[in-house]
A protein has these predicted regions:
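Conserved strand-to-helix beginnings and helix N-cap segments that scaffold or border functional pockets
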Residues: 28, 77-78, 172-173, 219-220, ...
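Cofactor-pocket helix-loop regions in the catalytic cores of large enzyme subunits
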Residues: 166-168, 173-178
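Class I S-adenosyl-L-methionine
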Residues: 1-25, 155-160, 180-270
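A generic local secondary-structure boundary/capping motif
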Residues: 53-57, 149-150, 174-175, 227
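Flexible loop/N-cap segments at domain edges
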Residues: 153-154, 160-168
């Protein structure tokens, strides 16, 4: 509506209103009128008179990513969007469509939700993704069919990860990747809260912190936990402050895993 605002203008028939003025009194009047009629309203650059925000959008339909600062800094939202645009391939929308087409078939074949999540994670890390990006959908169909035919219950594995001195920016890329895919995280006293925030949100987290003459879980108990969860087919992240082997007992844990036939990886940390 390109006209001066008047209180006689009824907004009740609109679902959404944007007040694009630089007059706070007008914004206030539009806001109050919308509030009275239960209409969503956004006043540009005037957060107190907003009932919704307009985020910066990365559109890879059906995949959509939105970035917002709750009106605090739209410029920052756009800057972050620009950074993310470069890291999200344009073919991601095709991959989402492809996944949706196969979702029911995969669910019928792999009924356990944790195993199904692992299947999709492994599939997205395989050559299938590039086939979909390049519109080679027949080849992609063959790859997922083959993956379903050859699917076996995943075997457990342990990741001995050094969390470094506590600064999340000092984590290695591999450490971060394994932390975010682990089903169980067993961590000690020296692992900082910001580091723990980077672990997978729904992972089971078990504290086994040690202080002098006060071990919440003795080393034998920690070894047993690692073997137990890995034997259940879970991916276990043993997260240690610093490096797993410097002032740590990673060597003992490896011996126990080796004796039990459990696969493991070691990721050094900055000390």
């Amino acid at each position: 509506i390109q006209a001066p605002y008047s209180a006689s203008l009824s907004l009740r028939y609109y679902r959404l209103v944007i007040a694009a003025t630089d007059d706070q009194a007008v914004n206030q009047a539009v806001f109050e009128a919308c509030e009275a009629d239960n209409v969503l309203v956004n006043s540009v650059d005037d957060p107190p008179h907003c009932r919704f925000m307009v985020p910066a959008i990365i559109d890879r339909s059906p995949l959509v990513v939105s970035i917002a600062t709750n009106g605090a800094s739209p410029v920052l939202s756009r800057q972050i969007r620009t950074q993310l645009e470069a890291s999200i391939p344009h073919g991601m929308g095709k991959l989402a469509d492809f996944s949706g087409k196969w979702r029911s078939t995969v669910k019928a074949k792999i009924m356990n939700p944790d195993e199904r999540r692992i299947f999709w994670e492994e599939l997205y890390a395989s050559p299938l993704k590039e086939q979909v990006f390049n519109n080679n959908l027949a080849e992609a169909d063959q790859l997922i069919t083959q993956a379903l035919t050859q699917w076996e219950k995943p075997k457990g594995e342990v990741y001995l990860v050094g969390a470094g001195p506590g600064d999340p920016e000092l984590l290695t890329l591999k450490a971060l990747r394994l932390m975010q895919q682990a089903d169980v995280v067993i961590y000690d006293r020296l692992v900082s809260a910001p580091i723990m925030e980077l672990c997978r949100r729904d992972a089971e987290k078990i504290y086994v912190g040690k202080a002098r003459s006060n071990h919440s879980v003795p080393q034998d108990g920690i070894n047993a936990l690692l073997v137990k969860y890995a034997s259940e087919g879970k991916r276990v992240c043993r997260l240690k402050g610093g490096d797993p082997f410097i002032f740590g007992r990673g060597g003992e844990e490896i011996q126990e895993l080796f004796a039990a036939g459990v696969a493991f990886q070691v990721v050094p940390g900055i000390t």
